[in-house]
């Protein structure tokens, strides 16, 4: 599927952050000088290696960066903490933590549900505090959009907008860098048709089978290799506009530009 480059360029200049934090000086200096450092990704299946943007993002980084994708299928902020996955992530002692949840927090299952206005925000604040306590830099990322269309546009009633707004609110109040992937991906998908967007669908993801009861239905949540590459690049090319010291560590992107997308 050929993608309209003009949309990428437009997105590259879209304001997406509410606050660009500075962070601990040694961490910033290491990134600017391309010394070895670690980025840890935490989140749900839309970040995870099997069907998320994480691998595509990690592939954009220079060899001095160790990118560790610890996102887990089916997890929410609540279950990620409750099951001990968050403590394992902290044990990595990363310099940067990219944190994206929402897809499972919105589900009614009490094992994963976290209310957008209350517990979801409390869980994000805990994660931000924990990362800062060990002198790391947290970056909050809103959820990747689903690819279900209504009347030729991405479905505005997917329930993720409330969680994106909640993440933005936490970022503003905690003075944390916020990357609005939900807004970016929704805007990009608005320029495609359902048929074109289905070109990113993954076949056979375990979460999709569990939810749909069959692997035959389209999986418009998880990503195939093309989707991983595209949306991973979207994250990389835009986060360097907010954490500008990361620019030298992303292949093909001038520091702070956020304008280079695959053609």
Ranges and model annotations:
Residues 15, 32, 38, 157-166:
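Short, charged N-terminal helix-start/capping segments
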Residues 20-74, 79, 84-93, 97, ...:
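Serine-esterase "nucleophile elbow" of acetyl-processing enzymes
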Residues 4-17:
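Bacterial N-terminal signal peptides
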Residues 83-252, 258-263:
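Alpha-helical cap/lid subdomain in secreted, periplasmic
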């Amino acid at each position: 599927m050929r993608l309209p480059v003009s949309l990428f360029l437009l997105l590259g200049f879209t304001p997406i952050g509410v606050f660009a934090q500075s962070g601990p000086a040694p961490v910033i200096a290491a990134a600017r000088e391309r010394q070895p450092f670690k980025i840890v990704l935490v989140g749900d299946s839309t970040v995870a290696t099997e069907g998320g943007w994480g691998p595509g993002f990690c592939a954009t980084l220079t060899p001095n960066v160790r990118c560790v994708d610890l996102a887990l299928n089916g997890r929410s902020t609540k279950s990620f903490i409750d099951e001990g996955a968050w403590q394992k992530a902290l044990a990595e002692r990363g310099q940067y933590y990219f944190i994206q949840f929402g897809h499972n927090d919105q589900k009614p299952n009490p094992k994963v549900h976290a209310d957008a206005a209350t517990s979801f925000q409390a869980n994000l604040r805990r994660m931000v505090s924990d990362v800062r306590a060990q002198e790391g830099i947290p970056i909050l990322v809103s959820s990747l959009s689903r690819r279900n269309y209504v009347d030729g546009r991405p479905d505005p009633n997917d329930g993720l907008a409330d969680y994106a707004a909640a993440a933005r609110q936490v970022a503003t109040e905690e003075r944390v860098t916020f990357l609005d992937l939900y807004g970016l991906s929704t805007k990009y998908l608005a320029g495609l048709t359902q048929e074109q967007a289905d070109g990113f669908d993954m076949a056979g993801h375990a979460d999709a089978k569990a939810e749909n009861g069959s692997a035959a239905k389209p999986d418009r949540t998880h990503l195939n290799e093309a989707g991983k590459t595209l949306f991973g690049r979207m994250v990389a090319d835009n986060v360097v506009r907010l954490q500008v010291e990361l620019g030298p560590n992303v292949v093909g992107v001038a520091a702070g530009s956020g304008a280079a997308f695959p053609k």
